[in-house]
Amino acid sequence: MIVLGIDPGSYTTGFAVLEKTTSVKVLDYGAILCKRSDSADKRLLHIVTELEKILDKYHPDVLSMEGVFFAKNPKSALMLGQVRGAVLVTCSRYGLSFAEYSPRSVKMAVAGNGAASKEQVAFMLKALLNLSVIEGPLDASDALAIAWTHASPPPLLSMLP
């Protein structure tokens, strides 16, 4: 099974591609970066175009994303919803199934603590995925955590709230 983890953002969208067989292996991870000067429609098009390249290269089976969280800024929340929608539609066109996890569940699956800090999650990810360092923006490590949550061994997944 190949899992695509996405951490959507209006300017930086993290992605991770993991392969789960008897173990979990990192195939790729990084971030889709949008120009701040671009209009919303151009940013969405860029995200979809880059996402399609990832889908064509790795042929994932499932899309894993965090559920919607509360945002203080309505404009930011609206844009995040548009990015999530673009990602969902694109992945649906490619036949991916969809799994959604709460931020607390992701932290619990990776670090064993639903209130873990980003640093604790990154530290555990390095150990779980046998990485010496996680390069790139935090959005990339968040996407790795989201993908790991779906690809993690069943005993961990069954304990999530």
PLM regions with names:
Residues 1-161:
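Phosphate- and other anionic-substrate recognition elements at nucleic-acid/protein interfaces
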